[in-house]
């Protein structure tokens, strides 16, 4: 028993370090998703079409968000290991790389959404639904998208700074900036969606304006606070004196980071395609999935934060060259993540019958959403394992393996399964959703074998 405890569980200092990193991320993400949930409920009170339009656009912008996440994460692997070596110059190179790549991705997103926004939204409106509801959903979606585009550059800058701070083990400032932004978003949502205290009742437009304002505030807070404290953040000193990056550093980041950028972008596109496959079962499914994803995002922060803890802690240990400690730490982190998320799954299952009642929509949509939430809860422990395995592979720079493990599997297995079941069978959305989730068990087995073999154990900055 003692041997098992030592192998799979850490001591007090171990968990203190883990939760010093994970808890601020959980708090920030938790508050963010809680306010997003309230935002979603507020929009849902206007009507099903407005809720569906906003949901579709958020699914499209989710691809951009994960593209930025991939852009900063590729360089972030090096940031964590440079920090483990206390190499300030190296950290500066990664920040510049993140910013330049983020600008390019943002310009591309602007072009795609402005030129092809209506076409992208229409892709989700192919299922059953009246012509009137489809037109209304498209109208609200276009309104929301055009305003949300203004916030993309601010989101990108925030992610560049927040990711760098986290990779250096500093999670408090991003949390504080996130909380401030969330409170601003919540207050403006209430004022601008419903027109309270003399403000205009802008509905969907009000929700978009509130989000953009909150992102501007978050960017201002995190950038100013970081640069005003060069003692704790030495990488800011001379950071923009030049934007040059040594060619060998660029080459290493591109080699390791490109698969990660492609992975996050293709994975997000895969998730958007899954939603499109599900929507073939009718417009009511879009609404039910929106309700499901809203509450799921709140509970998914548990394994998302633990995954980031894996990437940061294991990455820093790999930077020191202690492979034995990295492997031992990673094993304990994976076990902790799965156990924590099992408890989270039970709580989500209990809440499933209650949450859909907050939406002003039909009983059929509420019932479908309740069952989808229960299915999602059932697979949270599996997702916790998958997330920890993915971040383990990524921490050691095995980004090509992570690419095949994550996005290639998504497109070749998940999307193909969803499309086949949606178009070639009469199965309900509940069974289709269940079987798609179940296919990830194969990915879990593959990931477990790769991590156990130790293919990820390497220092990539020496």
Where are each of the predicted segments found?
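Short alpha-helical transmembrane segments in multi-pass integral membrane proteins
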Residues: 1-22, 79-151, 199-258, 314-379, ...
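Transmembrane helical elements of multi-pass membrane transporters/channels
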Residues: 20-39, 147, 181, 214-218, ...
